[in-house]
Amino acid sequence: MIEYLTNKFLNSKQTLLEKIVQIHDKKINITKLAKTLIEKSDCTKIDNTIGQKLLIKATYANDLDLVKALHDKGVKLGTKDLLGRTSLHHAIKAGAGKDLIEFLIDNAGIDINACDKSGSTLMHWAVNSHHIPAIKLLQTKKADYFTPDYLGQTPLKLAEYYGHDDVIELLAENSSAGYYV
């Protein structure tokens, strides 16, 4: 596969990694291909624009090894997209595993209570996605779940709206301020 892509795009002005991020064929394992290229490459740093695209693909693929490889090559894990969302937002939305989310929390330098452009915090995203491991991790990092988004919805109100009784119970039992909706 790598030989095919290398030969196909050899005369292109784009790098092979730039071409890889443009592939949307589900039959091709993009993250495995990118990891192989990064490991075999002699480059010490990856362009952040390309790195961000690969990082988002890696979070949706729940590929902690690729996220770590990109981080080692200088890709900034806390970079925000046009909507103010980071790789951590995308990992939570994608239902990524606890280890990947924990790695991003510990290494991305992201304010755990920062809002995206809709006013949603990471806790809003975790509750909205019904991502219990992410909610628990965010709680250990003292994430706020009483802050409303721009529509006035707190994570607790979202849990109630979606009927996530287990989330309501989890947030209420771990709340030092009590349960206010």
UniProtKB/Swiss-Prot annotation:
Keywords: ANK repeat, Repeat
Ranges: ANK repeats: 50-79, 83-114, 118-147, 151-180
Paired cysteines (S-S): none
Keyword Repeat: yes
Repeat is among the record's keywords: yes
Family annotation (InterPro entries): Ankyrin_rpt (IPR002110), Ankyrin_rpt-contain_sf (IPR036770)
Record-linked SUPFAM superfamilies: Ankyrin repeat
Pfam families: Ank_2 (PF12796)
PANTHER family: ANKYRIN REPEAT DOMAIN-CONTAINING PROTEIN 39 (PTHR24171:SF9), ANKYRIN REPEAT DOMAIN-CONTAINING PROTEIN 39-RELATED (PTHR24171)
The protein's name: Putative ankyrin repeat protein RBE_0150
